[in-house]
């Protein structure tokens, strides 16, 4: 099962003509199924392992989001990259876990499309990893090649676009984009390449990059879309999205958390409910012309059902 030019072209047309709705949080949804240590193959917390050990759990999460009415889901591959996988000593399984994650999402999307004929797409998630090349934690070429394996697996599994997400370091972001490009060249595939950055409550990326600098650095790489996800709720994203709307020459996306987490006796909770997220995204679409909307940490199928 591989990416097809027809599906990718349909996604491009949809992004150019209307607002496409993506899914919400993945990790918390997986944890709600209470996977065992055996499910994790003794790699507790490595959600990507579930793509091969418990594909039924991953498929059920995708099904819940498609059931809520979203147009596309992200693959369960946020940590299927060199640095994150190396933490579990499974860097050699990046391609395997990426392909499996994309295949599960693709099969679920096709199942729902088969029911009503409505197109549904798969966004291949390429997460930031756990090392910052700008600080010398890892060599640029190492993570670039790791991202190429990540992207090749996603394309082989049937992803319709590649989403470089939650980026915190511009050098890491560039490595992700170049790795994705090399994967497309190696496989003879062309799909939309989306980049979503994480900006802290301080107003900058983790390493201090401002929104203008990030746009200037990334837009010339030939990406198809740029935007924000994670780290904050929609309120804290407003000014950054305003800047992108004024200065970017490519379409925009927004996938905020359900507000800023609050500590309670039961642990962290996200305060923004479904209506709050929907209202914020509606405002962003109206004022900033977003093409792709969704949710990140703390968002659920109920949030997305209201957003749809």
How does the language model describe each region?
Residues 1-308:
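Domain-level signal for soluble alpha/beta catalytic cores
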